[in-house]
Each structure stands twice: as C-alpha cells, then as structure tokens.
Amino acid sequence: MATPWGAVFFLLMIACAGSTVFYREQQTWFEGVFLSSMCPANVSASTFYGIMFDAGSTGTRIHVYTFVQKAAGQLPFLEGEIFDSVKPGLSAFADQPKQGAQTVHALLEVAKDSIPRSHWKRTPVVLKATAGLRLLPEQKAQALLLEVEEIFKMSPFLVPDDSVSIMDGSYEGILAWVTVNFLTGQLHGHSQETMGTLDLGGASTQITFLPQFSKTLEQTPRDYLTSFEMFNSTFKLYTHSYLGFGLKAARLATLGALETEGTDGHTFRSACLPRWLEAEWIFGGVKYQYGGNQEGEMGFEPCYAEVLRVVQGKLHQPEEIRGSSFYAFSYYYDRAADTHLIDYEKGGVLKVEDFERKAREVCDNLESFTSGSPFLCMDLSYITALLKDGFGFADGTLLQLTKKVNNIETGWPGGHLSPAAVSGHLQLRLSVPLETCTSELLFTGRRGLGHFLQLRWRKPGLKPIDWLY
C-alpha cells in the first residue's frame, strides 16, 4: 500500500513502557508472525543493530537501526537510523522474482556499510511487504518472497523464522495509531483523548480511531474492531484497511483499467486529465497508455463523477468521525504539499473542504496545465471523494497533516523518499534485561511505518504469547 507508510514511512520508533496485549475479534488476522532474537553473542556488548525492509507498492526501503545500552541492566535507546530505497517495488517484478530479489540484495550493501562486521551474524534482517504484494496472485507473491528469503539466507545477517512475509493491512493502521498517539502523549493516563489516523498509500488506505460512543461499536462490523491493553488502560480500536483504494490503485479504477482485459493498444481516457495529454504510466509492472478526453468533458465536475464511482457505497461510514479530528499522512500529505496547502517540511492543519477547493482550482484549469503530475486533478478529486463520500467525513473535519511527531518521522511519500537519520533517546522497555536476551524486543515495520514495539497478541482460545511482526 502506501508505504512507499513507504508511506508509511516514516520510520517510527515507539517505546511501550509495559506489555501491549491485543485481542482480535476474529481468529485469522495475519500470517507470518515470528519471534526474533536480537541477543548479542557477547551480552555485555553495548551496541546492537536491526535491519528492516519495507516492501511497498512503489518502492522497497531499507532501515538500519542502531541501539545502545550504556550500562548493564539499563534500557537501550535508539541512537540512529540509516535509510535508503530503490524503485520500483517488488510487485513490479511479479514475473521476474529473481530480478526483484536482486533489488533487495543491492540494498543489503547499505546494511553492510552501516553495521560493523563483528555484529553481522547477530543482527536480524526482516522484510515486510504491504499492499503491492497483497494485490498480486498468491503464487506470484510467494515466489517473490521465497527469492528474497534466499537472498537473506545468503547474507551474513541473522535470518529469523518467517523473516519475509506480507503484513496484514489492518496492522498497518494499528501501528500508525499507536505510534502517533504514543509520541503525542495521548496514551498516558486514563483520559483516552486520542486522535484517529488516516494513511493513504499507493495500493491501500487505512483508517483507525478510538470510538467514543457505544453506538459506533454496535454498528461496526466485528472484524473492524481490535482491543489491546497499554499503560494499564484498555483500548478498543476501530481499524480497517481497504485494499485497492490507495491513490495509485484508484487511478487505475478511475481510468477503467481494472475492468479491461489486456492493456496493449488501449488508451484509457479521463475527464481528470488535460485534453491534449497522451502518455504512459507503469504501475505494478504493467504499462498503461492514458490521456485526456479529446472531444469530451474536462474539469472538476465530470472528474469528480468518475472518482465517485470508485468509492461510493464501498466503504463503511462510522457516524462519529464527522465530529472528530484525525492525523493524515502519506499521499494525503504529499498532495497537500504539492499544491501548497501545507508547508512541505512543517505540515499543517486542513479541513476536508480544503482538498475539494484545491481540486476545483486544479481541475478547472487543466487547459493551462504545464508542469507537475498530470494526475494532480484526479488525485485531489479522489482524496476529496474518499474523505467525504467514502469515509463520510464532514467538510469541516480537521486533519493534522504531518511528517513528524516530536521530531520522529511518522510518514513519508511513497516513491520519493530521501535518506533520513533519526536520532533520539526513545527508550524501549524490555520484558527481560539485555543480558538475559532481548527476545521480546519486537522488530516490526510497515509501508510508511516501521516500529520496534514490545507486543503481546492473543487469538481467541490461546494464551498470550510474544509475537514479532
């Protein structure tokens, strides 16, 4: 999906000062979870590392984390992050899995350059794929993952069981919500005055919030709800991931490309594009020819009618979100920054209606379009339709668009991420001292998000156990 949280991605570091226990309302939530052992061979070593790959729909990103423990028995802290990325994403190599895995192999050189050779054998390496691979036929997705796993096994790093897997979309939303509300201090105490999160990736989109009214819980599909405990409080979240509703997947749906068998010799046209435009676009390894309506309508109203068909009646609309405020990131942030609705570095606060206003401005001036993305009108119109007619937000709903919370990155643009280093003293609470092994330090990542998070998950009928995802 978005990633690209990856979106998502920010890479996030969150520290949980106690166990986090999840209770899912259905038995099958995600696959490929695993335990990781980040135990240094020499338990007195003060520095250790972790490698996370985020395989998003538009690119693959590597994050190399450095942790330091200043004294035995003390909590380790995050000292820094090294980031790099390649495009296109793994899904573009659906028919060439070995070639796709080579993009991961190239990024492993970043890890080798960043981590002392003496630490290689005890540094775990993990790859989590998101919506891009979820959209592929299972056989092709698994072929890619198997090739990546072989690359990992040939590397000098520690390869945990199930180190390569596809992340469940809803988990992306949960991680984003926990991260933002933890970093803003909203999870401390018992007020539960939290903010919801919206993440828009390339292939999927997530919405997550803490319902305040029992009516919302009663009217919500059971598999949209997740309960967990943190800081002696219980949180029952509304969270759902919509596969195929990411920004770039929505372009294909708007163009009608998803309903057409074969793309050779076919040009997909839209009222959302400049009339004179004739171009090609590659997404998911497929080349699409597209252009404007040479004789037909053009502008906001006909464009909005096209994107409305993509979302109308297809998303659940919890009534209480109309009066709530949300954090929004990934492509929400990008398109707002691209059109100067917010400052690119600082972000800002918008109302839902601001996206519509900018969409009208851009779409009704397509004749004078000269630079930037030819999809800008379509993207802004889709974001407007997704927020208003998809999720059911009110025009006046406030959205906090941000890349960082307390100087920790929470999201990044899918596809054009730049190297970043995150420094700080975010302490991680380990359930056991480092000298007895940090097996409960969970190494997790998402499209836009990556986290190290101590987490305990319980499926119905099972005892709480420690998962790594």
Curated annotation (Swiss-Prot):
Residue pairs linked by disulfide bridges in the UniProt entry: C272-C303, C363-C377
Pathway: Protein modification; protein glycosylation
Cell compartments where the protein resides: Endoplasmic reticulum; Secreted
Active site: E172 (proton acceptor)
Reactions catalysed: a ribonucleoside 5'-diphosphate + H2O = a ribonucleoside 5'-phosphate + phosphate + H(+); GDP + H2O = GMP + phosphate + H(+); UDP + H2O = UMP + phosphate + H(+); IDP + H2O = IMP + phosphate + H(+)
Keywords assigned by UniProt, alphabetized: Calcium, Disulfide bond, Endoplasmic reticulum, Glycoprotein, Hydrolase, Magnesium, Proto-oncogene, Secreted, Signal
Mod. after translation: N-glycosylated; high-mannose type.
One Gene Ontology cellular component: endoplasmic reticulum
Tissue: Expressed in fetal cells and most adult tissues.
Signal sequence coordinates: 1-24
Subunit organization: Monomer; active form. Homodimer; disulfide-linked. Homodimers are enzymatically inactive.
Note: ENTPD5 has transforming capacity and tumorigenic potential.
Protein name in UniProt: Ectonucleoside triphosphate diphosphohydrolase 5
Source organism per UniProt: Mesocricetus auratus
Gene giving rise to this polypeptide: ENTPD5
